[in-house]
């Protein structure tokens, strides 16, 4: 256990356009080298594309996509008696959100569209409909946990 006091969590202000804290966090995940204006342009551009392509409310599509991507269980390596076991553990809510956002960003980066806002829009639409690379990452994580269920008694 750490001897120092716990560092308080910084409160993130909601984004100006939609008033969503989750979206503001995602902008921070997309941001590179402290360029928040660029990150905002990418995310808002992607949300405009989502609205144009689906005709649905973009913030709802974003929330649905994030909720679909959030992992419930993951595996952690645990060394027991000279052997490494992949032990399935439940993911804490804060980490769930962080992983979902990171996976969404990485999946969007790897897509083939021309600009990042188009890639992100495509990945958001796919994830909200239960498909795409980010959803595959979640399914793979769950499969790993399911396959290693036998080692769940090593949980610490």
Swiss-Prot record:
GO terms for biological process: translation. Keywords: Ribonucleoprotein, Ribosomal protein, RNA-binding, rRNA-binding, tRNA-binding. It holds the Pfam family Ribosomal_S7. HAMAP family: Ribosomal_uS7_B. The lineage of its organism: Bacteria, Pseudomonadati, Pseudomonadota, Betaproteobacteria, Burkholderiales. PANTHER family: RIBOSOMAL PROTEIN S7. NCBIfam families: rpsG_bact. The keyword Ribonucleoprotein applies. One of its GO terms (cellular component) is small ribosomal subunit. Part of the 30S ribosomal subunit. Contacts proteins S9 and S11. Coiled coil: none annotated. Belongs to the universal ribosomal protein uS7 family. The keyword Nucleotide-binding does not apply. This is Small ribosomal subunit protein uS7. GO terms for molecular function: rRNA binding; structural constituent of ribosome; tRNA binding. One of the primary rRNA binding proteins, it binds directly to 16S rRNA where it nucleates assembly of the head domain of the 30S subunit. Is located at the subunit interface close to the decoding center, probably blocks exit of the E-site tRNA.
């Amino acid at each position: 256990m750490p001897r120092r006091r716990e560092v308080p969590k910084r409160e993130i202000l909601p984004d100006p356009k939609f008033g969503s804290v989750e979206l503001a966090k995602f902008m921070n995940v997309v941001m590179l080298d402290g360029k928040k204006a660029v990150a905002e342009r990418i995310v808002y551009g992607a949300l405009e594309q989502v609205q144009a392509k689906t005709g649905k409310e973009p913030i709802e599509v974003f929330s649905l996509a994030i909720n679909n991507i959030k992992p419930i269980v993951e595996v952690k390596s645990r060394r027991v008696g000279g052997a490494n076991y992949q032990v399935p553990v439940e993911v804490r809510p804060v980490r769930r959100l962080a992983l979902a956002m990171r996976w969404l960003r990485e999946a969007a980066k790897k897509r083939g569209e021309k600009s990042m806002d188009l890639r992100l829009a495509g990945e958001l639409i796919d994830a909200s409909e239960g498909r795409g690379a980010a959803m595959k990452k979640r399914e793979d994580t769950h499969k790993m946990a399911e396959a290693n269920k036998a080692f769940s008694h090593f949980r610490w």
